[in-house]
Amino acid sequence: MTHPRTCLAIGLAVLGIAPAIHSQPRQPPDPMKAITTSFNNVHKNLLEMAEDFPADKYGFKPKPEMRSFGEVLVHVFSGTTYAAKAGRGEAVQWNELDPKSYVDKAAVVAGFKKAIAEADATLKATPSTRFAASPEPWLSVIEHSAEHYGLLVAYYRLNNLVPPVSRPKK
């Protein structure tokens, strides 16, 4: 008879504590940390694709009217370059970089690395209070880059390749 009472007492105690545990307020994520983490993640994945995709397929287009794999990457880092300049407070217009200036895979990868480094330096130099006021231009460039990451996954699959992040972990 004491066993059921003990179980009941323990059960009621747990039920009494559970709401208190769950009701503790959670701190919202720091805007600067959230933006920086998202920016770094999407650009790390894109750079990994840029370095991994076969050089002889950089000119691949799913349809003639679409950008090639290499042209998509140049388009993406045009946005990254824009964000770096706008993030520093420069009066800047979106100026599309000319993909013809990036003649091969090595040039595209180097240009992308440069754009990421420039944006990373701007992010690190930006006071965290700035992000609380507005996440722009960073939120827009993260969204833009992520959209094109998804597009480039299709380029991989159309070439019977597996994107780096979809491969089994070693």
Located regions from the model:
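N-terminal beta-strand motif that seeds the catalytic metal site of vicinal oxygen chelate
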Residues: 27-39
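Bacterial N-terminal signal peptides that target proteins for export
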Residues: 1-10
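Acidic/histidine-rich, surface-exposed loop or edge segments in extracytoplasmic proteins
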Residues: 25-30, 89-101
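Acidic/histidine-rich alpha-helical segments that form the ligand environment
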Residues: 38, 100-145, 149
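Well-ordered alpha-helical scaffold segments within catalytic/enzyme domains
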Residues: 45, 49-50, 84, 118, ...
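N-terminal signal peptide c-region/cleavage motif recognized by signal peptidases
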Residues: 18-20
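Short, contiguous alpha-helical
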Residues: 36-40, 44-47, 57-96, 132-170
